[in-house]
């Protein structure tokens, strides 16, 4: 599966647009790690447990979006974007979205 942030795939022609595809996850950290993170904000610096959580969540959302595109028979997802929102005090949603398309390779 080709996934790009652009609205085109170099070397290919878009022959069919299949629609918007999304993948999302709502995730939160363990209460103990939340407390440790709160203390870390007082001192400043990176909160590694949250960085790791967001990287993992982004990867899961991306995989879910790709799975949805594959179910539609897509060759690629164009215009990939990520979004995030706070669902509650210690939980965040990560959303991956784009447009599923069918491609044809351009002759060289």
Curated annotation (Swiss-Prot):
Stretches that traverse the bilayer: none
Entry-linked InterPro entries: UPF0145_dom_sf, UPF0145_YbjQ-like
Family note: Belongs to the UPF0145 family.
Protein name, per record: UPF0145 protein Fnod_0426
């Amino acid at each position: 599966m080709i996934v790009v942030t652009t609205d085109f795939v170099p070397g290919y022609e878009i022959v069919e647009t299949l629609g918007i595809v999304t993948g999302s996850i709502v995730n939160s950290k363990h209460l103990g790690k939340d407390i440790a993170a709160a203390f870390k904000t007082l001192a400043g610096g990176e909160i590694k447990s949250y960085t790791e959580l967001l990287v993992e969540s982004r990867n899961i959302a991306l995989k879910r979006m790709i799975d949805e595109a594959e179910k539609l028979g897509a060759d690629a997802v164009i215009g990939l974007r990520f979004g995030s929102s706070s669902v509650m005090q210690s939980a965040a949603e990560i959303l991956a979205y784009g447009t599923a398309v069918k491609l044809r390779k351009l002759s060289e």
